[in-house]
């Protein structure tokens, strides 16, 4: 019996899902949180049960050991030998990786080298890879890159309008992110629409704590909102999205606690977006509650958020010369009907119309009116399944 674990590692977390392959059956899922902090928590979901335990988990290697022990303890597996593949989500693959790759020491070093492109993510991915190599040295490890799907972008879309030597010598360009999600929901959208993806023009909107919009032409990414790093694009939960780059030296020169570029980038990554503007939360549910309570900062944060998403969708309607569908996915994309309504309401000139009842009560499929010139879909993303499939493909 072949089992594959799909891993999404963060700096202090390890999210996982165990699949029976090739049947694609989810056997168990879980998350280990607060790695390296006090009161680490391991949560396992299996057979309709959910169990959590507070443990001492100082690093990712210990986290991996606990994950595997949990699988045995709860009789989810009978022996480690049943695990035949580990798939790792990797945010930044740069130009090294145009598709998923079997991991050796060389690949780990290259992923680590690309940490500047995803400083919040790649170091954690490397830590998880090394942990699995230490604990299960004989098992195949595969890296699945968020950036791989976007390698089809044309040069005029991925190059910045700066001297080309900065691309040729330093690889400064747009790489994008969330590619695994955009790939999955585009193909699922084609199924919902009952048309081959090779005929479709789609705008996919991955709206979670991170936000990215992608223009998909006939199954390929031709432009996307995240850039050299996942900091670019629309406003996000704690990330600013696009700002005038001249703001950075201005803040360094004038704000005492922002001593250098690293301080400013940290602020833009972790203290901005919905959290920074509202002053109290990066969670859209809290922002909506703040709006109900007539909090002006919550209203402002929400309005900026909606405005930035509409602008990117408008850009990509122009890039694609129209679209067959707009697809909402990820945490907010799937679960925030007010946000979807307000985004689409600003696109009515394009003949895009939501069915208000379907928008509120439908959680999958077409939520637009019969008259809408562009379909509006809600599709649940499943990056873990794509990762498991890639492991199976590379075995």
From Swiss-Prot:
User: What Gene Ontology molecular function terms does this protein carry?
Assistant: acetate kinase activity; ATP binding; magnesium ion binding
Q: Which cofactors, if any, are listed as required?
A: Mg(2+); Mn(2+)
What residues correspond to the site Transition state stabilizer?
178, 239
Q: Please name the SUPFAM superfamilies in this protein's record.
A: Actin-like ATPase domain
Q: What reactions does this protein catalyze?
A: acetate + ATP = acetyl phosphate + ADP
**Has keyword Metal-binding?**
yes
Q: To which pathway does this protein belong?
A: Metabolic intermediate biosynthesis; acetyl-CoA biosynthesis; acetyl-CoA from acetate: step 1/2
Broad class of the protein's primary localization: cytoplasm
Chain residues that bind ATP: 15, 206-210, 283-285, 331-335
Q: Where in the cell is it found?
A: Cytoplasm
Q: How does it assemble?
A: Homodimer.
Q: What does this protein do?
A: Catalyzes the formation of acetyl phosphate from acetate and ATP. Can also catalyze the reverse reaction.
Give the protein family.
Belongs to the acetokinase family.
- This chain's protein is named Acetate kinase
Gene behind this chain?
A: ackA
């Amino acid at each position: 019996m072949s089992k594959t674990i799909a891993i999404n590692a963060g700096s202090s977390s390890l999210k996982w899902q165990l699949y029976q392959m090739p049947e694609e059956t989810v056997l168990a899922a879980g998350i280990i949180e607060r790695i390296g902090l006090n009161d680490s928590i391991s949560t396992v979901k299996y057979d309709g049960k959910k169990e959590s335990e507070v443990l001492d988990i100082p690093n990712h290697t210990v986290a991996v050991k606990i994950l595997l022990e949990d699988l045995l303890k709860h009789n989810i597996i009978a022996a480690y030998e049943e695990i035949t593949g580990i798939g790792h989500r990797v945010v930044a693959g740069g130009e090294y990786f145009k598709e998923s790759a079997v991991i050796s020491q060389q690949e780990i070093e290259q992923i680590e080298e690309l940490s500047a492109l995803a400083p919040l993510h790649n170091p954690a991915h490397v830590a998880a890879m090394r942990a699995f190599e230490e604990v299960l040295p004989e098992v195949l490890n595969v890296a699945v890159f968020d950036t791989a799907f976007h390698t089809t972008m044309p040069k005029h879309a991925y190059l910045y309008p700066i001297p080309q030597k900065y691309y040729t010598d330093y690889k400064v360009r747009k790489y994008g992110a969330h590619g695994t999600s955009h790939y999955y929901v585009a193909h699922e959208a084609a199924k919902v629409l009952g048309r081959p993806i090779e005929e479709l023009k789609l705008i996919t909107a991955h709206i979670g704590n991170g936000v990215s919009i992608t223009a998909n032409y006939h199954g390929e990414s031709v432009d996307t909102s995240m850039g050299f790093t996942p900091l670019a694009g629309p406003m996000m939960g704690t990330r600013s999205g696009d700002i005038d780059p001249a703001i950075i030296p201005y803040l360094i020169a004038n704000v005492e606690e922002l001593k250098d570029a690293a301080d400013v980038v940290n602020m833009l990554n972790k203290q901005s977006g919905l959290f920074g503007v509202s002053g109290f939360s990066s969670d859209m549910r809290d922002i909506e509650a703040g709006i109900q309570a007539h909090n002006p900062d919550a209203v402002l944060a929400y309005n900026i958020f909606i405005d930035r998403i509409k602008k990117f969708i408008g850009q990509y309607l122009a890039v694609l010369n129209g679209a067959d569908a707009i697809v909402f996915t990820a945490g907010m994309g799937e679960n925030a009907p007010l946000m979807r309504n307000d985004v689409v309401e600003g696109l009515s000139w394009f003949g895009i119309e939501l069915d208000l009842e379907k928008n509120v009560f439908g959680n999958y499929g077409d939520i637009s009116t019969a008259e809408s010139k562009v379909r509006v879909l809600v599709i649940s993303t499943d990056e873990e399944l794509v990762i498991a499939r890639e492991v199976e493909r590379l075995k």
